[in-house]
Amino acid sequence: MRLLTTIIATAMLTTLTVSTAGGQEANYSREGADTCLSCHEEDSTLALFKGAHANPTDPRGPFGHGQLQCEACHGPGGDHAARVRRGQERPEITIRFGAGATASVEQQNGACLGCHEADAGFGWHGNDHDMNEIACADCHTSHTASDPVLMTSTQPEVCFDCHQQQRTQMLKPYAHPIRQGKMDCSGCHSTHGATSEWQFAQQTLNQTCFDCHAEKRGPYLWEHAPVAEDCGNCHDPHGSNYPGMLSMRGPMLCQSCHSQEGHPSVPADADGLPGVAASPYMLGQNCLNCHTQSHGSNHPSGSRLMR
């Protein structure tokens, strides 16, 4: 009987001990989350049980059957939870996330990627956030019922913590309905799987825009080259002082490519000839007053994009 007890105890200790990358042994606590909750009873910790990470019915989650619970993310906590003698300091938890993090960004993200890297469309390594050493916990909040960065109404504020210029642009008179809570940043950007320069949700800017603005996609009988090339040639997607989120006022925007030379920009006289010198900005009017189909036209006589 004593031999059997010894064998069982040895097996238990073996399951509670793993080897770290450095060859050292790290001890897991014997009672999982119960050990942690004996001290960590604050609301910010208990909120974990309202979210997806603590769902006991999800076999993929940290609290699924046979999983390591808190230690699946925070690493082995046996030493941290052990009784501390008077005068000694309690060892730090293996991986602490977010503010006051003691682990490197690589260690923090490694804990998350251990599960989430298998998600469809997920490609963290090499994208802009990874290259700038952004930790998952800088954007995500796990100990909560609803992660703010996953909610349309709250996601922009999380992004704006770093992207201050975009916050300012969104305050301009003409912008996507971000502030109204009708769309979020991830409608256009993919922070995890994008490989494009600006981390677009699709491979290019135009493909991303056309997801919503399908009527501008074409193909058209009469194309407007800047539209086919890059929507950003004419539009400021984060906000503008001009209708249609144009990057400049109509005449100046158009004349950044089109010269006014040879264009009747003043009222003609009785002979159909200009009466005075042409105004460089067409009397302050807007090219779009006449060239209404600026994205392209399928009209047989629409080569000038006027119908």
Regions found by a protein language model. Give the residues of each.
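Bacterial N-terminal signal peptides
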Residues: 6-17
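Short sequence/structural segments immediately N-terminal
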Residues: 20-307
